[in-house]
C-alpha cells in the first residue's frame, strides 16, 4: 500500500529549483530564437531599418531585475511599465525563453530512464512511425476502439498549477503566471468552441509544453491504475496470494477516488487494453465487451473532471467495433478486416474444403484529407485537378522542380506504410502535373508542348527520389524493386508538417 501511495505523491527527484537564475541570462533568449532554421531571431522594430540584435534582450533583462516593475496594471494593460509598447515581441521572447528553460529537466529524466531500462537507439522512440508496428501487433486481437478527443483545461491557471509539481522554484512560476495574465490575448488562443486544444503559432512551444505536462499528469495516474491490475495472470498458490494483495491495493485506490465518483475495481482488470496518444487525440482499444468500453468512457470523463479540472463530455469519446470501423490516426485510416482464404485438405479418399478467415490490420492513405491539404497549398483545386503555382513562377527551373520533388518525397516517405498505394499514386500525379503546369506558365508555353519539349526528364526527377527511398529496403540487384508493395516504416520521422506552411 505504501508503494501505491508513494507513486501518487510528489517525487522529490522531479523538483528543480535552479531555473529562476537562468531566466536572467541573455543567451537563453537568443538560443530560443536561433534554431538554425533561417528565420528571424530578435527583430527590433525600428521603422524601415529593421535589424537583428540581442540588445533588446539586454534591455528586457535589465527591466526584469527591477522587481518593483513586476506589477500588473489592471487599468491600462497596453501601457504596462514593464512590457512597454513592444508587448507582443517581449511576450514572445519570454514565452520561448521560459520554454527552453523548463524543458531542460525532461530530457535528463528521459535519458536516465532509458539507461535504466537498457533501451538502445532511444531516438527511434520519437518517431511517429514507431506507433504503427505496435498497432499492427496488438490491434489484431482486439474488438473495440475508442476515439478520444483529449479535453483542454478551462483556465490557464490549471496549466501553471500542473507545472508546480515539476518545478519547485516559486519565483519561476510567479513570473510565468504574470505573463500569462498580463498578455491577455493569450486567453483567446484557447477556443472553447472547438474540440481540441488550439495553440498560437507565435507561442506554440510554451503552450505545447504546458499542455503536454498537464496531459502527462493524468496519464501517469491512469496508466498506473491500469498496470497494477493486469500483470498477474497465473493461478498458482503463491501468485494467488500476491494477486489478492494487489486487489487490495486497487480497492484502496478506488476508495481514494470514491469521494468524487463511484468506480469498480473490475474496471481495471481487463488485460487487453491498449492506449496510444498523439497531440490532442488518443485511442483506447480493448478486447472487452461494449459494456466495458462504456465503463471506460464514463470513468475517463469523471477522472478528467473531478481530479484534473478539465471539462469533458461522453460525446467526445466514440466507441466503434474494429471489424467494421476505420479510425483516423496520424494521417492514416486504420481498420481490422478479415482476409478470407480457402484451404483444400486431402485425407485418404476424402477431401475437404476449409474456409479460413485471418484478421488483417489495414492501413490506407485517406485521399480526401490529402487533396484538401494540397488544395490549401494551391497545388490543385478542391476536386483534385492540378493547377500551377504562380507564387513560384519567378524561381529557377531547378528550384521549382526540387521543391515539388521534395514534397513528393516527403509524402512518399511518410505514407510508405500504406496497405494500398493507389491513393498515394494519385497524389504523386497531382504534384507532377502541378510542377509541369508551373514550369509551363513560367515559360509561357502550353503544358502539352512543354512536356513534349522537356521529354522524360521531369518524370525521372520524381522517380529518382522514389528509387532512393526504396533502395534502403530492396537491394539494387533485385528485379522486383519497382514491383515492391510491402509496408515500410521509417524511424526518422518526428513531426507532420502542413504543406501550406512550407511555401
From Swiss-Prot:
It is found in: Plastid, Chloroplast. Pfam families: Intron_maturas2, MatK_N. InterPro entries: Domain_X, Maturase_MatK, Maturase_MatK_N. GO terms for biological process: mRNA processing; RNA splicing; tRNA processing. Coiled coil: none annotated. GO terms for molecular function: RNA binding. Keywords: Chloroplast, mRNA processing, Plastid, RNA-binding, tRNA processing. GO terms for cellular component: chloroplast. It comes from the Eukaryota. Usually encoded in the trnK tRNA gene intron. Probably assists in splicing its own and other chloroplast group II introns. Belongs to the intron maturase 2 family. MatK subfamily. This is Maturase K. It comes from Liquidambar formosana (Formosan gum).
